[in-house]
């Protein structure tokens, strides 16, 4: 009885401690961010095992219609869990409906078709704009409470798309990312209280995980991978957070040939006035491991407002940039209250800020919108890198209220922090650097 009482008190104290943690702007972090129980499919309704409904284990047989029929059956009968058993199942675009969930058992593989005609063109969201484009392999729109779980794998089968992209780029060097027709792996939109846990998301033809206009999304213990060699997988961002709030990314491994965590939201000279766009707020990325990627945490390039963003307790190995602020001269942007702390490992650049001019277009706007990045804190960081401070001065944006606190940096290049670039730059405690000289 005494032990039980002690346990209860300890638990209450632990929850109280968590509840006192704050976002960078001082707001208390809600308890929701600390409740991370894994999905129990037994509490989600009837299980619909796809092989009970005519779907067979065959990696070469396209079975989109049969798998979709199981989803529709579940939806029409009060909802439930679509279960994919051990084996490999080839499919085009699948559309989940209210009350339905997806679970991949161990050694199960949902394999995407490498024929773009198996992904219908729909009204969707892509690269900061709402437009008609190809559906993803897994599409979840207006499905509150959706879960994707299990120890299986979603394989985008992207190599054919990647090779085609690079061939097009050789012939048309200025082609856009969307000119080469290819699907995303997972697109979740207008859905709240979503959880994606444990699965492996690999070899996406385009963006891997894209969430748009969602509230309360947890991405837990995912393994997200696309190769950087021998064939580079272009634009395969691990997680794109697009006009969302209350998002937790925890315990994930990410290694992709683009940005790992990319904060999106819109682009263009009037992007902040378009109701289809929006900011990202109250985002926590913690306890993750990052392999090769262009940016661990990237604001942009299609982004207008990011507020209360935390990246903490993460390990890096071969990432190019830790914090990358892409400043578009054709888009009004505000990146504020961003905290990066307790980071270890190696990276090419710790903080990278520069104008992003790819596909620059002011349209009919006469003046160039000025963007702002402020209240950016980096603390308790121990990294080996090529350079720490890669920040360009520009009239296109204003930087203010940055804080570097307790940084231990081993750099190949001299570490020079130009305090004239950032207004109200604060250097706290020991900021120690070791310059590795060539022998």
What spans do the regions from the language model cover?
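Right-handed parallel beta-helix
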Residues: 106-107, 144-153, 192-203, 215-228, ...
